[in-house]
């Protein structure tokens, strides 16, 4: 698989360092079965809902069963939200897409 921690050009060096700290903290939380309380502490209910919606968007786009417009209507989100998910998928590596397929399209 490709490197898991590529530098994100959209982030400043400090933001990248902070992001890596967050990812490391989450990895440790999952290792110690503390993921739910840590995510509830760090994310607002709206942020948790937005992340869950983003996963659903990625899943539905990968399955190809609905058009972007149908997905927008089903989820009650803006077309720009669907487009961001679609654009993210376009730039994901083949390894990441294959992993997502295994996880989301079982």
UniProtKB/Swiss-Prot annotation:
Annotated Gene Ontology cellular components are: cytoplasm
Tell me where the transmembrane regions lie: none
Compartments reported by the entry: Cytoplasm
Q: Which PANTHER family match?
A: TRP OPERON REPRESSOR
The family note in this entry says: Belongs to the TrpR family.
Question: Does the keyword section mention DNA-binding?
Answer: yes
Which keywords does this Swiss-Prot/TrEMBL entry list?
Cytoplasm, DNA-binding, Repressor, Transcription, Transcription regulation
Q: Name one Pfam family in it.
A: Trp_repressor
SUPFAM superfamilies for the chain: TrpR-like
Q: What's the stated role of this polypeptide? A: This protein is an aporepressor. When complexed with L-tryptophan it binds the operator region of the trp operon (5'-ACTAGT-'3') and prevents the initiation of transcription. The complex also regulates trp repressor biosynthesis by binding to its regulatory region.
Q: Which gene encodes it?
A: trpR
Q: What name appears for this protein in its UniProt entry?
A: Trp operon repressor
Biological processes annotated in GO: negative regulation of DNA-templated transcription
């Amino acid at each position: 698989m490709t490197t898991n921690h590529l530098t994100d050009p959209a982030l400043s060096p400090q933001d990248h360092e902070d992001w890596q700290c967050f990812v490391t903290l989450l990895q440790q939380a999952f290792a110690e079965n503390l993921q739910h309380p840590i995510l509830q502490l760090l994310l607002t209910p709206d942020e948790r809902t937005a992340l869950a919606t983003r996963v659903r968007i990625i899943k539905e786009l990968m399955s190809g069963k609905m058009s972007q417009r149908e997905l927008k209507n089903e989820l009650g989100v803006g077309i720009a939200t669907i487009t961001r998910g679609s654009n993210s998928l376009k730039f994901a590596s083949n390894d990441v897409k294959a992993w997502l397929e295994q996880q989301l399209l079982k």
